[in-house]
Amino acid sequence: MTRTPLIAGNWKMNLDHQQAIATVQKLAWTLDDADFDYEGVEVVIAPPFTDLRSAQTLIDAEGFKLILAAQDLSDQDHGAYTGDISGEFLAKLNCQYVLIGHSERRMIHNESDQLVHAKVLAAKRHGIVPIVCVGESLEQKNAGQTEVPINQVLEAVKDTGISELVIAYEPVWAIGTGEVATAEQAEETIRGIRESLAEQVDEGLAEKTRILYGGSVKANNVAGFLKMPNIDGVLVGGASLDSEEFANIARFREHIGV
């Protein structure tokens, strides 16, 4: 089965709505100038909540083929939840994807596996594809706890009956540190995630689920990861704020001669 590669940019808490407009325009124009094949590779951006409406309006008005994702959502659909954002609202903004369980949410906001699971269900209710982020800390890595990202995936999707899913393996020790897992290390973990998903959840879901690598990804190292058979794309952090750099990452096939 051929899985369409997915290149996603997580802007985190960067760029206001005016900066977002300029960044989206430059990214789209750069890719269009290079005759980018959007049918063969999905390009997804995850701006801050305050940027989503501006980005959506621009994408729709200009016919850009970029896809919107949100950086998080509430496990609740509506009500007295000050500061939370419902999946219903995101769906109305044509967010096709949503990041769930990013390591910064797990660490800074103490999000548990149980809350991540509830958010996956919320995304499913509103027809948004969850990008479930998993990964081990430096302490867990040093302790040989290689099962951590696998267990996080299984806890996120158990009993959900979900039919479409993206997983982003981001070793916490490689996020924003400049330290990068080797392509072989990433492939080994991602293969283990896929095998466990097949064995314990659903073989068909495991086969079609795209699993991304994230952690200090740049244009000069993306090719090594995407040559691997089980790595279906990347989740990019800081480098996605630079339109030209992110466009070069999205054009990874030029780097690997495909």
Report the location of each language-model feature.
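Active-site loop-to-helix "anion-binding N-cap" substructures in soluble metabolic enzymes
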Residues: M1-V258
